[in-house]
Design a protein with these regions (language model features):
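Positions that flank functional sites
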Residues: 32, 107, 129-130
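Conserved catalytic-core motifs of GNAT/GCN5-like acyltransferases
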Residues: 103, 116, 121-139
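Acetyl-CoA-dependent GNAT
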Residues: 3-74, 82-87, 91, 95, ...
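Short hydrophobic/aromatic beta-strand or adjacent loop that forms the aromatic wall/cage
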Residues: 40, 137-142
Length: 155
């Protein structure tokens, strides 16, 4: 991927972050710094020439973790996240990754429903993990998609 293309993609991801997570958005520079690590990669979905969705993930040996995933608000509920998961699952399984982890706010019911639809299961709950000023703390759910079990069941 050429540098100009990558920079514009990262800028678009940072812009989407600001739209969908204004209090917790990761900046362009944070994304650039993370992507300098060999274990971290970025998938993007385009519509025409526009970045409409992204997934930032990290691989560590036989396990991967989604660090950030998002879809531009104008393109939500159009299957963008499912396309991201399909591509990510294909890449990770080709690399013999056994499981994929993610963390989600327990009050983010649309995201949880999507993750469950993709085959993720809740494996842990962090009580009061997300703290927001003037609001009660929200739990974090750790969810896992186990490729090894999927392969065993389908094989």
């Amino acid at each position: 991927m050429n540098g100009v293309f990558l920079k514009s993609s990262i800028k678009a991801v940072a812009d989407i972050e600001t739209l969908i997570q204004p209090q917790d958005a990761w900046s362009y520079q944070t994304l650039v710094d993370l992507l300098e690590q060999d274990s971290i990669d970025l998938l993007v979905v385009y519509q025409s020439d526009t970045v409409v969705g992204y997934c930032l993930y990290q691989m560590m040996f036989e396990q991967a973790e989604i660090l950030r995933i998002g879809t531009h608000p104008n393109y939500q509920r159009q299957g963008i996240a499912s396309k991201l998961f399909a591509k990510l699952n294909q890449q990770l399984q080709a690399l013999t990754v056994e499981s994929l982890l993610l963390e989600v706010r327990a009050d983010n019911l649309p995201a949880i429903a999507l993750y469950e639809q993709q085959g993720f299961e809740t494996i842990h709950q962090r009580k009061g993990y997300y703290k927001t000023a003037h609001k009660p703390a929200t739990d974090a759910l750790i969810m896992q998609l186990n490729y090894k079990n999927k392969a065993d069941r389908s094989g």
